[in-house]
Structures are given as structure tokens and as C-alpha cells.
């Protein structure tokens, strides 16, 4: 299990938000933490700690008046740590190369691939061809409904018809290098991980899988290690001391 850091950017600022609270209308979100530091500061911190494979997420839609400020922050972070960070948020074949050339190791994609509630295999091929399989991470962010974990899109606001299963991951795995999975219902709440989801993800062995959502303590990290059979990497946001939480960054920085 490795620690994968994050830089979440909303309205041009590095923030930690409650995952299910994003609303495109008015660019609103329930905030846990708003940093006085810029995205490049965190990129430099992760670089110095030798942490690779973290992700930068743009939390504004392309139609937002704040999108350009958010994108500018993201590009600064990539420039500070070339090859060390992945990027997601509004990625499509038309802009994937721009982010890779700016220093991203991988691009993260959800909404472009899961169109109108189902997988667009055509779009998946397009983004794989544009970015290259070795630079593509599929973000299977999901929310629980009727006992299943459904993939959600559009900044986690829209449910798709696609359920996270091993079979689905095996099919999608031929197109990508890694998976990132946000457990959106617990994201930003730091009240514990989605154990059932972690147990499912821990059965998948073909590609690296990073779990994000709900980690509030070192006990939660250990629970995730147990549930995921040690196979899952972990992203911690709101619970980290660098984002106003109590888990020391230095402790997790040893997990690499």
C-alpha cells in the first residue's frame, strides 16, 4: 500500500471539500479546508517527499467562470513536479496532450468515457489513442445505491447505469494503466472508509488501484489495508495536517 497525495482545486484555490456537495450552479461546495498556499506549493512538497502518482483534480466545469483560474493553478503544479502527478477534471482527447506536455504523468478520465449513463467504448478508444494506454487512469468514482456501487460523473452529481464490478474493471483494464476510485458518499467526511468497496477493489490484481474517501485516522488506513488485502494505494485529503486535519503528512509520506 502506497500513499498517493492529492491537490484538489476549486475556484482557483486548493481546497478539501465534501465529495457529494459539489454543485456546478454557482460553483458551490461544502468546504473542509481552503489553503492559503497555491497548488505549486503542494506539488513541491510532494516532490521533496519523493511521493509519486498523486493526483491534481480540477473541480470546476469548463463552463465555469472560475475554470481558467483553476486550470492555471493545475498547470503550475504540473510544472513544479514533472512526471510526478496525474491530472483529472474535464479531460478529453482534445486537451490530454496539453496536460501531458505540461508535465502530467497520466490523465484521469470519468465523464468523457461514461456518457449518457453508460460506457462509450468509442470515447474510451479515442482517449486511449490520444493519451496512450500507459498515460491513462480511469476514475471509477462511485456512490452506493440499492446495494451496489454505481459510477458517478459530472463532478459526482450524475449517477450512471454502470456498477463497479471485477468484470467491468477487467474489461476496462485493457484500455488504461491504473484505476482511481473515489468513494463519493464518504469523501471529505473523514469518518471511515467504505469497507465493502475496498474489499471488492482488493480482489482486482491486474493494475494499480488507488482508493480515496473517508480516511480520518491511521486506524482507517489499517482497515483499508486489511479490506483491500494490502493491494490498494490510498489517497488521504481532509484528514491530513497539511489540509487542516490530524494525520501527520510525514507519517504517510513514509508509505511509498
Locate the predicted segments by residue.
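Conserved anion-binding
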Residues: 10-11, 17-25, 100-186
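N-terminal beta-alpha supersecondary unit
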Residues: 14, 19-67
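C-terminal helical cap(s) of enzyme catalytic domains, especially alpha/beta-barrels
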Residues: 119-130, 221-256
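Conserved, mostly hydrophobic/aromatic
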Residues: 8, 46, 54, 87, ...
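Catalytic cores of alpha/beta
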Residues: 73-106, 196-234, 250-252
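Conserved beta-strand positions in the central sheet of alpha/beta enzyme cores
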Residues: 55-56, 108-109, 137-139, 180, ...
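Charged helix-capping and loop-helix junction motifs
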Residues: 67-74, 120-125, 161-166, 191-199, ...
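Glycine-rich, proline-tolerant flexible connector loops at the mouths of alpha/beta enzymes
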Residues: 51-72, 111-117, 181-190
Amino acid at each position: 500500500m502506497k500513499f498517493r497525495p492529492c491537490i484538489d482545486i476549486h475556484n482557483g484555490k486548493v481546497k478539501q471539500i465534501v465529495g457529494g456537495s459539489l454543485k456546478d450552479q454557482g460553483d458551490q461546495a461544502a468546504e473542509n479546508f481552503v489553503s492559503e498556499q497555491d497548488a505549486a506549493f503542494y506539488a513541491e512538497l510532494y516532490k521533496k517527499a519523493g511521493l509519486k502518482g498523486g493526483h491534481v483534480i480540477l473541480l470546476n466545469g469548463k463552463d465555469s467562470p472560475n475554470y481558467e483560474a483553476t486550470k492555471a493553478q493545475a498547470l503550475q503544479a504540473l510544472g513544479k513536479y514533472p512526471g510526478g502527478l496525474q491530472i483529472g477534471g474535464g479531460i478529453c482527447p482534445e486537451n490530454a496532450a496539453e496536460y501531458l506536455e505540461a508535465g502530467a504523468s497520466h490523465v484521469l478520465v470519468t465523464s468523457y468515457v461514461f456518457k449518457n449513463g453508460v460506457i462509450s467504448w468509442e470515447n474510451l478508444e479515442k482517449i486511449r489513442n490520444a493519451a496512450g494506454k500507459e498515460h491513462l487512469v480511469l476514475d471509477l468514482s462511485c456512490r452506493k445505491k440499492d446495494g451496489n456501487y454505481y459510477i458517478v460523473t459530472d463532478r459526482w452529481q450524475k449517477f450512471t447505469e454502470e456498477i463497479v464490478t471485477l468484470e467491468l474493471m477487467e474489461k476496462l483494464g485493457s484500455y488504461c494503466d491504473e484505476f482511481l476510485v473515489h468513494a463519493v458518499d464518504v469523501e471529505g467526511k473523514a469518518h471511515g472508509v467504505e469497507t465493502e468497496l475496498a474489499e471488492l477493489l482488493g480482489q482486482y490484481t491486474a493494475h494499480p488501484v488507488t482508493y480515496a474517501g473517508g480516511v480520518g485516522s491511521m486506524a482507517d488506513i489499517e482497515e483499508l489495508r486489511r479490506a483491500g488485502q494490502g493491494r490498494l494505494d490510498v489517497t488521504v485529503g481532509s484528514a491530513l495536517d497539511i489540509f487542516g486535519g490530524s494525520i501527520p503528512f510525514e507519517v504517510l509520506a513514509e508509505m511509498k
